[in-house]
Amino acid sequence: MKKKWWHDKVAYQIYPKSFLDTNGDGIGDLGGIISKLDYLKELGIDIIWLSPIYKSPFVDQGYDISDYYAIAEEFGTMEQFEELLAEAKKRDMYIIMDLVINHCSDQHEWFQKALADPEGEYADYFYFRKGKNGNPPSNYRSYFGGSCWEPVPGTDLYYLHMFAKEQPDLNWENPVVRKKLYEMVNWWLEKGLAGFRIDAIINIKKDLTFSDLDPDGPDGLANCWRMVENVDGVGIFLEDLKKHTFQKYDAFTVGEVFNMKEGELADFIGENGHFSTIFDFSAHILSEGEHGWYDAPPVDFKEWRKAISDSQLRVQTCGLEANIIENHDEPRGVSRFLPDYAQNPAGTKMLGTVSILLRGIPFIYQGQEIGMQNAVWNSVEEYNDINTIDQYHTARNAGLTDKEALKACSKLSRDNARTPVPVSYTHLRAHETPEHL
């Protein structure tokens, strides 16, 4: 394997909204990130991954982008972003951003034009299909629950959304869409961005027959993942993306890839793979339930250890994986992976040490370095995460009480990772530990 500039780097993910607020509006911002660059440098961080800071209605906390070329005013300005790039460069640090191109916001100009003329040019930027006898085109369930198809008022058409209805899927079969997305990616790389974490990218290739599938839940729907899992051709899209963007800039790319087929690892992260690396989620799927969070099993520590070991052996001959304990989509690792008796300073340090010492590129999530644990939630109204709210109702519909449904959500909610980082601890050096651990 040829050595790349990122092979010996340590990455740190920032969820800007809850990192550090410097203007008193209760929302973390770019100024807060800039002010903590020295702290992150002293912590040993080389690469900073920013969760979405693009203009957005924030239905899905920024993963619904309404303008790919603008910074959300909640976080600051383009001038501040450019300052962040410059200040990071002074410290020999690199900035990467989330790249969300499976879908956009329903407030994006493209989608608004498509709604205005569902038979026009922009309709082909998305997936519009006619319903069947007053019902959606197929029985797919979105990742956030409910049908993947949303009706277009005043027509017999529906549009596809694998996530929230406010996140219409982009039509990657349309070469015009691909070209416009590539132009946007290159625009950011020209600014000095070092690369991207690519969100939900495996979903871009669909089974265009949109045929009904056997239901896999009491709602009569089938998981939308089944629409993409057996379709060939995603690699063609990914190679085209790489050729026209990342490859030209020697950019660092991290793919969010789930459920790869046997033998595909080298295609994704080999010498000529689609991405520089992908996240290792092998341990995270241990706590997946059959029907939702409410029937998710607790993680057996020996199974966790075996999952990590197997993953390390599997990747030895073809590349490097990105090792994570937690991120913005996962609960806190201490609460998830450690048994109650090990949720103490020794257990917390062990968990972090294992992640850092594994072969690969370590990714630390904000607050992980001080051992942050899951938060306490007293009602479903306290949650911001759209997926958590859906999981709560899924549990209630399955017969669980309010208390039982909340308990299930409290273990696995994405909001556990999105609570504010205690500012009083962000002055700590890598060798120091806060008193409460």
Where are these regions (language model features)?
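Active-site and adjacent substrate-binding regions of carbohydrate-active enzymes
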Residues: 1-437
